[in-house]
């Protein structure tokens, strides 16, 4: 049985995953996380509820935490719906709660001023719907 620690995940993220209730990685996580941490491209497919957000999110968080900080967007995640964008942002926030990274989510149908202000302050990870990102 594989553990999250055996996948090369750093302690701050391991602690957050444990706090979030994750005990052991799913198949998609076991295959994608080490490849993502190593900087390789990953194309994965898995059923709903198998932890795909963790599978791609943990490597993003770990690689960004190991690099320097800046005021520019360092990772961009595009999603087709606002609900999925919010869910991904909430999960990344939970997984990265012990890291000095910031994340934001932007989508249409709400006032843009708070979203623009957040981007001006600097964001490491941006999750967005394509339509609003374009505007």
Predicted regions mapped to residue ranges:
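Hydrophobic alpha-helical transmembrane segments of integral membrane proteins
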Residues: 30, 55-56, 76
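Conserved pre-motif I regulatory segment
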Residues: 1-45
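Conserved phosphate-coupling serine/threonine residues in phosphotransfer and NTP-handling enzymes
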Residues: 26, 48-50, 81, 129
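Conserved nucleic-acid-binding Ia/Ib motif block in the N-terminal RecA-like helicase ATPase lobe
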Residues: 70-132
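Walker A/P-loop
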Residues: 41-56
């Amino acid at each position: 049985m594989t553990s999250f620690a055996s996948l090369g995940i750093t302690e701050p993220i391991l602690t957050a995953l444990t706090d979030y209730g994750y005990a052991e990685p799913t198949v998609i996580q076991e295959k994608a996380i080490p490849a993502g941490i190593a900087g390789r491209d990953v194309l994965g497919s898995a059923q709903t509820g198998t932890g795909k957000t963790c599978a791609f999110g943990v490597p993003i968080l770990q690689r960004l935490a190991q690099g320097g900080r800046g005021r520019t967007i360092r990772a961009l995640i595009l999603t087709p719906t606002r609900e999925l964008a919010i869910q991904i942002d909430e999960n990344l926030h939970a997984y990265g709660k012990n890291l000095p990274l910031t994340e934001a989510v932007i989508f249409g149908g709400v006032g843009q001023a708070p979203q623009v202000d957040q981007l001006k302050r600097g964001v490491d990870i941006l999750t967005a719907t394509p339509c609003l990102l374009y505007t």
